[in-house]
UniProtKB/Swiss-Prot annotation:
The lineage of its organism: Eukaryota, Metazoa, Chordata, Craniata, Vertebrata. GO terms for cellular component: extracellular region. Expressed by the skin glands. GO terms for biological process: defense response to bacterium. Has antibacterial activity against E.coli and S.aureus strains. The keyword Electron transport does not apply. This is Esculentin-2JDa. It comes from Odorrana jingdongensis. It is found in: Secreted. Disulfide bonds join C31-C37. Its main location: secreted.
Amino acid sequence: GLFTLIKGAAKLIGKTVAKEAGKTGLELMACKITNQC
């Protein structure tokens, strides 16, 4: 029912946020390594 829908949406949002955060983190590390921050 509704609970399953909310749980599914939360999981999807969590995945998206994690992916974006991971991408940002990698970019930050790359610019620190190359000293281009």
